[in-house]
């Protein structure tokens, strides 16, 4: 299973390239990659980039593919699935739980559905922490042609399997945390070094 990291966003709310912002001396994106590398079900990692940041991302040591569409999450997922089945996450999710990723991939393999997506009790989906079949790409292609870029709607109208989040270990929920603003960085205490516990730089 490919681990696809969507890393083509512009980070407008953050005020700069948040994926390269350093936390305890290490780029935010690297935390996401390292957590994904710890998942036993992930065989290789691919970074889905924009044309603008593709060269910078090659420094992270993984294959980089360019999202030519730049229509949001759907375009990134569509691009990733050109390479095969993929577990897709956003690059700004530094608290990924490897065991949770493995759990989702196992459910995906068992269910044999086009997608396997975590779902909250209120119906809210987590499409950027989910497993997708390469066959789902054909379904997305029709959406893209009609300019319907709503990924949650596409998932709901496909024959997806869902993982009920409230039935899982509560500690796994931190896996969904993503950094949108600089204020969000204050929640990243687990990533600070022991020697520099109060420094985010």
Curated annotation (Swiss-Prot):
Mg(2+) binds at residue 92. Transfers a GMP moiety from GTP to Mo-molybdopterin (Mo-MPT) cofactor (Moco or molybdenum cofactor) to form Mo-molybdopterin guanine dinucleotide (Mo-MGD) cofactor. Keywords: Cytoplasm, GTP-binding, Magnesium, Metal-binding, Molybdenum cofactor biosynthesis, Nucleotide-binding, Transferase. One of its GO terms (molecular function) is molybdenum cofactor guanylyltransferase activity. This is Probable molybdenum cofactor guanylyltransferase. It is found in: Cytoplasm. The gene is mobA. Disulfide bonds: none annotated. It comes from Thermococcus kodakarensis (strain ATCC BAA-918 / JCM 12380 / KOD1).
């Amino acid at each position: 299973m490919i681990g696809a990291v969507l890393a083509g966003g512009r980070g407008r709310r953050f005020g700069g390239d948040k994926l390269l912002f350093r936390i305890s001396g290490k780029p935010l994106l690297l935390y996401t990659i390292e957590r994904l590398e710890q998942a036993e079900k992930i065989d290789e990692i691919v970074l889905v980039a924009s044309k603008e940041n593709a060269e910078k991302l090659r420094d992270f040591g993984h294959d980089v593919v360019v999202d030519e569409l730049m229509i949001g999450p759907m375009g990134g997922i569509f691009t990733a699935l050109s390479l095969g089945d993929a577990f897709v996450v956003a690059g700004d999710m530094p608290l990924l739980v490897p065991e949770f990723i493995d759990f989702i991939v196992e459910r995906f393999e068992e269910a044999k559905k086009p997608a396997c997506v975590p779902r909250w009790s209120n119906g809210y989906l987590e499409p950027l922490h989910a497993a997708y079949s390469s066959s789902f790409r054909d379904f997305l292609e029709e959406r893209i042609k009609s300019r319907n870029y709503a990924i949650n709607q596409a998932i709901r109208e496909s024959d997806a399997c869902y993982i009920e989040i409230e039935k899982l270990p509560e500690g796994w929920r931190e896996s969904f945390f993503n950094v949108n603003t600089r204020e969000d960085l204050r929640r990243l205490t687990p990533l600070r070094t022991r020697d520099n516990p109060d420094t985010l730089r």
